[in-house]
């Protein structure tokens, strides 16, 4: 799998921004078929930072109502990437 298709987008929630400020962790949405090792290699190669650890969260689909019908959202996968001490990622600093 191509490293640019592994990482989809960063997650900008209040909890994710608090993790970034307090514990030097970045939350990103990743492809559903990847594992921790692939996420770590892709993140280090794309953003040129050292990664300490990666945690993976599988997000279950939620039931949403559309008019009279009920549908499900797609299942997704999030990764919490812990950067090594002294490393900074300037991509999310301005948010």
Swiss-Prot record:
Instruction: Specify whether Signal is a keyword of the entry.
Output: no
One of the Pfam families matching this protein, by short name: Ribosomal_L23
Q: Which organism is it from?
A: Thermodesulfovibrio yellowstonii (strain ATCC 51303 / DSM 11347 / YP87)
Q: Which cysteines are joined by disulfide bonds?
A: none
Q: What does this protein do?
A: One of the early assembly proteins it binds 23S rRNA. One of the proteins that surrounds the polypeptide exit tunnel on the outside of the ribosome. Forms the main docking site for trigger factor binding to the ribosome.
Chain's gene name = rplW
A single GO molecular function, which one? structural constituent of ribosome
Q: Kindly state one GO CC term assigned in the UniProt record.
A: cytosolic large ribosomal subunit
Q: Give the family from UniProt.
A: Belongs to the universal ribosomal protein uL23 family.
Assigned keywords, A-Z: Ribonucleoprotein, Ribosomal protein, RNA-binding, rRNA-binding
Q: Which InterPro entries match?
A: Nucleotide-bd_a/b_plait_sf, Ribosomal_uL23-like, Ribosomal_uL23/eL15/eS24_sf, Ribosomal_uL23_CS
Which Gene Ontology BP terms does the record give? translation
Quote the subunit structure annotation. Part of the 50S ribosomal subunit. Contacts protein L29, and trigger factor when it is bound to the ribosome.
Q: Under what name is this protein listed?
A: Large ribosomal subunit protein uL23
């Amino acid at each position: 799998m191509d490293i640019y298709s592994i990482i989809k987008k960063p997650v900008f929630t209040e909890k994710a921004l608090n993790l970034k400020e307090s514990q030097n962790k970045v939350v990103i949405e990743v492809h559903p078929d990847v594992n921790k090792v692939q996420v770590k290699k892709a993140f280090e190669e794309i953003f040129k930072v050292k990664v300490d650890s990666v945690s993976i969260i599988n997000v279950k689909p939620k039931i949403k109502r559309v008019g009279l019908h009920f549908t499900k959202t797609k299942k997704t996968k999030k990764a919490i990437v812990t950067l090594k001490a002294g490393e900074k990622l300037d991509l999310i600093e301005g948010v």
